[in-house]
Amino acid sequence: LEPLADLILADRTVDPMAAAENFINAEKGVADAASALTGARDILAERISLDPGLRETLREFMSTRGELVSKWVELGGDQPADADAQSAKFKDYFEFREALSKIPSHRVLAVLRGRREGVLAVSVELTPDEELQSPHPAESLIAKHYGIERTGRLADDWLLSVCRWAWRVKLRLSIETDLLEEIRERAEETAIGVFGENLRDLLLAAP
């Protein structure tokens, strides 16, 4: 189905559903045009997700505009007797968000510790208003990267839906994982630096 994906991407005037009719092949598991388009979508989404230039653009965008978000995960089932006390340590982060570009290292480490202990669900998001935008700003960046826009051509809407699928299914979690690892490393380096400075001051002050 790669030829179908390439055809639609190269010629936006093509009707995707009509083009897909030519790729129906029951023996290969492509029962109808919709199945052919699903396969073509997956091929393009995978290609998009592996584009290093695009990934860097999205990573930089989410790093600059994104917020670290944490929410309380309600504990269920049999829990240790001190489970509530353990959760209470992270109460300041039960409903929390702060810009990645501004959040201090100690808060980053606290949030990530809460996630490790199963108390907090953690994500990287844009502002609530931006997250509700349709298309999502990240989807718009993907579309812009490939010169895809709604101009009335037959393939425009289908290609925009591929951008949406690529972000939601292929790229979002991957970019989020990269950013969480990046801020964790930065926060740990800062914490080590602060500890070293404090230890130095303590040793210099010793009689």
Task: Walk through the language-model features, giving the residues of each.
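Duplex nucleic acid-engaging cores and interfaces of nucleic-acid transaction enzymes
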Residues: 1-206
